[in-house]
UniProtKB/Swiss-Prot annotation:
Protein name: Small ribosomal subunit protein uS17
Single GO biological process annotation from the record: translation
GO molecular function list: rRNA binding; structural constituent of ribosome
Any Gene Ontology CC annotation: cytosolic small ribosomal subunit
SUPFAM superfamilies xref list: Nucleic acid-binding proteins
InterPro entries with a match to the protein in the record: NA-bd_OB-fold, Ribosomal_uS17, Ribosomal_uS17_bact/chlr, Ribosomal_uS17_CS
Organism: Acinetobacter baylyi (strain ATCC 33305 / BD413 / ADP1)
Length: 85
């Protein structure tokens, strides 16, 4: 059997108000198709945080998983960097 590679992303927690859920802002840089200027693009993803470990401003790693709810299909892997108080 072939192993499936798991997609992982790193981003900043922008909301932790929900129970067992966080919103993670993923930023990436893309080049403008015509002008070539480097532009920042961002995506907000809802992720499952079973033990409510991640706090606002933390840098976290999330992985793709099965759909947990209508908007949640990612799971928290680890907190990479804790936000300064």
């Amino acid at each position: 059997m072939s192993e499936k590679t798991v997609r992982t992303l790193t981003g900043k927690v922008v909301s932790d108000k929900m129970d067992k859920s966080i919103v993670v802002l993923i930023e990436r840089r893309v080049q403008h198709p015509l002008y070539g200027k480097s532009i920042r693009r961002s995506t907000k993803l809802h992720a499952h945080d079973e033990n409510n470990v991640a706090k606002l401003g933390d840098l976290v790693t999330i992985k793709e998983s099965r759909p947990i709810s209508k908007t949640k299909a990612w799971t928290l892997v680890e907190v990479v960097e804790v936000a300064a108080e």
